[in-house]
Regions:
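Structural motif
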Residues: 56, 146-148, 167
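Short, low-order "capping/linker" segments at domain edges
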Residues: 104-121
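Residue-level signal for inorganic ion chemistry
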Residues: 61, 114, 142, 184
């Protein structure tokens, strides 16, 4: 279509913009707020000319959730919301929803075993609660099948500037390897005696 006659075609760029701007907000109204839904768009592609309305477009993004129930329901919810958003715009879509790993759900007994083992292996003030991350973690697949607990091992030496894990400037203090071995050994022994 031509931009001088948008009423004669489906304005695909407008449709993509509608999904981009409305989907994240609508998900927060459909999902339990404790799921902490984080939808972020990483790529949008459609058309090249300023005066032509393209026929096709691609939108790519990620949806991260903090609880399993919401993670299980998300695909159907995303499909339904896109359908509702695009219906008045007369736009069709194909959804290629690829589930990543589920959210990490630590089991309480395993978590307490590891916490106690860490206090013994390292020291009492070396153990801190960490905020749940929206990053994908493959260990979640194991926790789906077997009770367990995921912990983060601090690897900052306290001297060099602290940077994000994914930064090109990230340097792990290799002394953390020995601390990790002590932690896992104490955790394993505690589990055997539990």
């Amino acid at each position: 279509g031509h931009t001088s006659r948008p009423h004669l075609t489906t304005d695909l760029v407008y449709a993509l913009g509608t999904v981009i701007t409305q989907m994240p907000a609508l998900l927060t109204r459909k999902l339990d707020p404790r799921a902490a839904a984080v939808m972020v768009w990483g790529a949008v592609q459609s058309g090249e000319a300023a005066n032509a309305i393209p026929r096709e477009g691609v939108l790519r993004g990620t949806l991260r959730l903090m609880d399993r129930r919401s993670w299980d329901a998300a695909e159907g919810m995303v499909r339904d919301l896109i359908t509702q958003l695009l219906a008045p715009l007369d736009a069709r879509f194909e959804l290629d929803y690829r589930r990543g790993v589920p959210p990490v759900m630590n089991e309480a007994v395993s978590t307490e075993l590891m916490r106690t083992a860490a206090q013994r292996a390292l020291c009492a003030n070396a153990v801190r609660d960490a905020e749940q991350s929206t990053g994908a973690e493959d260990f979640a697949v194991f926790l789906d099948r077997v009770p367990g607990s995921l912990a983060r091992l601090g690897v900052w030496d306290g001297i060099i500037p602290r940077v994000d894990l994914h930064s090109s400037q990230f340097v792990a203090d290799e002394r953390a390897v020995a601390a990790g071995v002590r932690l896992m050994t104490h955790t394993m022994l505690a589990a055997l005696h539990h």
